[in-house]
Structures are given as C-alpha cells and as structure tokens.
Amino acid sequence: MSLFVASTRSAFRAAAPIKRSFQTRRSYATEPSKGGSSSTILLGAAAVGLAGAGAYFFSGAGAAKKAEASVKQVTEKITPGEIKKAFVGGDQGWLSLKLEEVELVNHNTKRLRFRLPEDDMVSGLHVASAILTKFKPIDAEKAVLRPYTPISDESAQGYIDLLVKKYEGGPMSTYLHDMAPGQRLDIKGPLPKYPWEANKHKHIALVAGGTGITPMYQLIRAIFNNPDDKTKVTLVFGNVSEEDVLLKHELATIENHYPQRFRAFYVLDNPPKEWAGNKGYINKDLLKTVLPEPKNEDIKIFVCGPPGMMNSISGNKKSPRDQGELTGILKELGYSPDQVYKF
C-alpha cells in the first residue's frame, strides 16, 4: 500500500513549463570551503526569502572597487579545471553583488536576480544551505543581517535568484523591494542547514508556511533531479490566499511527474469559493492523516514558516544553531526530536 494517504488533491494540477529564471542583529557562521563540484540540477525555480530586514546599497566608484576586490578574492584561489564557486565560506567575507533583474511575482513578492562575480561561477551552495544578506541603514550603528535561501539551481552559472516577500516593518525586505537594477547588496555564505544526501531517509514530510517553502523547494528539487534518489516526499503548504502560494506551477509539475513519490497538500486561510483543497490553518487532523506515522523507521519531518505556525506545529528554534524543544502538534502526534528538523 502506498505510503501516501488519500486526501483532497491540490487544485494546482496543470503543469506549466519550468523556467530557469526566475530583529535584532544575529550572528551566523558560514561553512568552510569544500572541494569538488556542485551537483547538477535540472529544474529551475525562483527563490523565496526567509524573512525581512533593512537595506543599504553601494554606488559609484566605491561599488566598482568593491566588486573588483570580490572577484579577485574568489578567483585567486581557483585551481585549473576546478568549478568556480562564488561563496566558499570560512574567512571569505562579504561579496558585493549587483542586482541584475527584478520581476514582480504577486502583490507582495518579487524575484531578484543577483550577478555572481564571474559568469562561469556557480553559487557554491549545497542542499540544504542559505546565504546571509547585510546592509547598514543610514545613521544606524549596526548593520542588519538576514538569511535567505536561494532556490535557483545550485548548478546555475553567473547568478542567484531570491524570491523576496515584503513584510510590513521589515527593513531588509523593504529595502530589497526598493532596489533597482545596478544597485549592490552584501552577501556571504554558505550557511549550512540540514546536510542532504540521496536516500538519507525513505520518506520525508515538509510542513511549510508562506515563504518557508524556500528550503523545502531546495530539498524537493535536489531529490527529484537525482535519478538515484528514491525518497518519498509529502508537502503540506499553508498560505493566506491562493495568490500567496509561491512556486505552485513548479510543485505541480513535479507532482505530475512523480505521483507515487510526491504529494502536495495546500491549505488556505482565505480560500476562493471554488477552492477544492484544505481550508483554515494547518492542523492536527490534517497532519495525522497525511504525514508518515512516527512509528515508521527512517522518516524526517521538516518545518519552516512564520513564528506563529512554528509555535503551533513544532515550537520555534532558540537560535540558528539551537533547534530548541520539540513542542506543538508534532510532539502531540508522537514524533521524537530526532525525527524533526526546524529550518
């Protein structure tokens, strides 16, 4: 019998062509550089920001000098025949990347494409990892730092894409939405998250809310682009309205291609009248129905979303490096801390 429990299918069944395109200050450590090439990724996507924060841009001669220094810093360490990686971690420091393209995705979300220092460079990110953005508001004493998960292909050369939702009062997301092509942003990485390898678990479940789909999509894409990876995936994705569902065409395409291994369940707080999916919030009854049972061996539940959702489902993290106590619905359903990972 299939591991996937029958439930209301998503309304997003029509496949669309996949495009190759498109607080307080916290301390984040980047991962040291590793050898080898990045994995080949076939499906394109946009990238969703994890949270909002403030902004500052560089212009004029200072920007040019900063960009030249970034290129020199990265390229002088490259050996012949090695794939160039923009983000190598360790003591690399910040790269000043130029905004190349801006695309309006919906009423509060934009896709931003930043150029890497060289056209034949890949980002250097792996699954699952993120980047850290920085800006210093005018007259502010401290810079604002915020992590984002690019889900442009890890093998894409010359650019990274961020899909950024604008949050009211969020200085970084507000600044990023105000940026124009040609302006620059300080970025570094990679920020290591959950190290994925093919068939690490037999079945994973991804519980996401809003822009929390970002690291989930990074995992999904890596799994289904690898013919050797047979992992089964269940996605539960909550949003306010249908318009807020990001990456819906990409997700529907994967589900249509792999119906026995990938199932997506969408939950809308304010659904349209014709909505055939789940309504309200992600709740205990839904998760009990569609998630793999906690008694099953070799499963993992990933959670990412706004603080209120995290508190209800799993409890929030204490810090970027501290998963915190497992609470909420997942604990009530009998999952152990080892079976749950909070992005």
UniProtKB/Swiss-Prot annotation:
Catalyzed reactions: 2 Fe(III)-[cytochrome b5] + NADH = 2 Fe(II)-[cytochrome b5] + NAD(+) + H(+)
Q: Which GO terms describe its biological process?
A: ergosterol biosynthetic process
Q: Which domain of life is it from?
A: Eukaryota
Q: Per UniProt, what is one Pfam family of this protein?
A: FAD_binding_6
Primary enzyme class:
oxidoreductase
| PROSITE patterns per the UniProt record, alphabetical | FAD_FR
Q: Which Gene3D superfamilies match?
A: Nucleotide-binding domain of ferredoxin-NADP reductase (FNR) module, Translation factors
What Enzyme Commission number(s) appear in the record? 1.6.2.2
The residues that cross the membrane are: 41-61
**Membrane topology (UniProt):** Single-pass membrane protein
The protein's location, in the record's own words, is: Mitochondrion outer membrane
Please provide one cellular component term from the Gene Ontology annotations of this protein.
mitochondrial outer membrane
Q: Which UniProt keywords apply?
A: FAD, Flavoprotein, Membrane, Mitochondrion, Mitochondrion outer membrane, NAD, Oxidoreductase, Transmembrane, Transmembrane helix
Q: Which SUPFAM superfamilies match?
A: Ferredoxin reductase-like, C-terminal NADP-linked domain (SSF52343), Riboflavin synthase domain-like (SSF63380)
Q: Which GO terms describe its molecular function?
A: cytochrome-b5 reductase activity, acting on NAD(P)H
The entry's function note states:
May mediate the reduction of outer membrane cytochrome b5.
Q: What is this protein called?
A: NADH-cytochrome b5 reductase 2
Its organism's taxonomic lineage begins at:
Eukaryota, Fungi, Dikarya, Ascomycota, Pezizomycotina
